[in-house]
Structures are given as structure tokens and as C-alpha cells.
């Protein structure tokens, strides 16, 4: 009998969060920039330049911010692991009892918890403490470069749509074309991310469409009233 491995959505949390955030931000922020500029009725080359600048600056900003944020998390994890390693060397018996207590709190009897702690300590003490005491494992472990690349790429991909629309859409209908294409792709992106994460597609689509409309509506209003470009 063949057993199929279960799909666990938590395995996707790290890269999915960065990718969805980047794509949403790239699409929505760049579209909002273009709509804000287009509402002031400028020339096409100004709209294209605004879209390109928004795409490049936004992608770099997302990547840098994600790298710094996840690097801080990684530094904290490394410090915790170093401290745990030192404690295992200096007071192994105390650490063994601490590990056993973790399993007791999860429902094991005192004897079973101690036996599990002993066996896992013999196998790999630091790994056992990192996983079960600190909550650090290969799935949730911080990966700064991976997160930064995902954010940069996803932002650029998201921003590519409004940039492309700015090249081909009629100037007088630019705002409507940008809004229409962006809402459709925001709905698609929301549905994909919800399905990949095991969440409700309907709620995800409604949420992303609502906030997308709010963001684009505000920039269109500001651009129309004041004739300025806002992001």
C-alpha cells in the first residue's frame, strides 16, 4: 500500500508570505503611482518614468527591508543556539530535565518524557533543544537571502503589469485601464495565495479588492485635486 505524504501549509509560510507581500505591494503601489500621475493628466513619458522608478525603487526597498528584518531574526536564533550549546556543555543534566519537562507539558508521562529526552539527546542534543525548546527548525528557520530574493522578484513581477499597461493604454483612459487590469490580477493573486495557504479564497479576494480599490482611489483623488504624484 502506498502512502502519500500529507501537504502541510506551514512548509510554505516563509516564502509564501514574502512572495505574496511583494507581488501585492508591487502591483498595488506601482498602479497607485501611475493612477495618481495619470489623474493629473501628464504626458505618457512621465507616466512610464513614474512606473519604472516605482518598480525599481520598490523592488530594492522590499528586498533590503526583508533582508534586514529576517537577518535580525537569524541573529537572534544564532544567539539562542550558541547559548543553548554552551548550557548543554556546562550543565547537561539540567538541560536534559528541561527537555523532559517540555514533553511532559505536551502530554507525556514523566517516565516517557524522560526516556524521549534521553534518546533525542543521545541522537542530537542541540537539534532536540532547538526544535522542541526554542522552536527553531529547518522549516521555520530564518533565511535572509531567500526572503530578500523572493521579495525583490515578486515585487518586480507585480509591478510589471502597471508598467506594461502604462506603455499601451490610451492616455485619456489610463486610470480606468490601470484600475481594471490591477483589480483582475489582484483577484487572481488573492485566489492563488489563498489556495496555496489553505485559506478561504472568497475572503482573500474580497479583502485584497477592497484595500486595492481604497489605495488606488485615494491616489487618483489626490492626483486629480492637487496634480501631484504620490506613492
Range-by-range predicted roles:
Residues 1-69:
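Internal alpha-helical transmembrane segments
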Residues 188-213:
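Interfacial loop-to-transmembrane junctions
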Residues 57, 61, 158, 162, ...:
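Alpha-helical transmembrane segments of multipass membrane proteins
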Residues 1-11, 70-152:
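Cytosol/matrix-facing amphipathic helices and coiled-coil assembly/linker segments
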Amino acid at each position: 500500500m502506498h502512502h502519500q505524504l500529507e501537504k502541510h501549509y506551514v512548509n510554505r509560510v516563509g516564502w509564501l508570505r514574502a512572495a505574496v507581500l511583494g507581488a501585492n505591494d508591487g502591483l498595488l503601489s506601482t498602479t497607485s503611482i501611475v493612477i495618481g500621475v495619470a489623474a493629473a493628466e501628464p504626458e505618457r513619458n512621465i507616466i512610464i518614468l513614474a512606473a519604472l522608478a516605482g518598480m525599481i525603487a520598490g523592488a530594492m526597498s522590499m528586498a533590503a527591508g526583508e533582508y534586514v528584518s529576517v537577518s535580525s531574526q537569524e541573529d537572534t536564533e544564532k544567539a539562542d543556539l550558541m547559548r543553548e550549546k554552551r548550557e548543554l556543555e556546562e550543565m547537561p543534566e539540567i538541560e536534559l530535565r528541561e527537555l523532559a519537562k517540555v514533553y511532559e507539558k505536551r502530554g507525556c508521562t514523566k517516565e516517557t518524557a524522560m526516556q524521549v529526552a534521553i534518546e533525542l539527546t543521545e541522537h542530537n542534543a542541540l537539534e532536540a533543544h532547538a526544535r522542541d525548546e526554542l522552536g527553531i527548525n529547518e522549516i521555520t528557520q530564518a533565511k535572509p537571502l531567500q526572503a530578500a530574493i523572493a521579495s525583490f522578484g515578486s515585487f518586480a513581477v507585480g509591478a510589471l503589469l502597471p508598467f506594461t499597461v502604462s506603455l499601451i493604454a490610451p492616455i485619456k483612459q489610463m486610470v480606468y485601464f490601470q484600475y481594471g487590469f490591477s483589480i483582475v490580477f489582484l483577484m487572481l493573486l488573492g485566489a492563488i495565495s489563498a489556495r496555496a495557504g489553505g485559506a478561504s479564497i472568497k475572503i482573500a479576494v474580497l479583502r485584497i479588492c477592497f484595500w486595492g480599490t481604497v489605495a488606488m482611489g485615494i491616489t487618483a483623488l489626490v492626483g486629480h485635486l492637487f496634480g501631484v504624484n504620490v506613492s
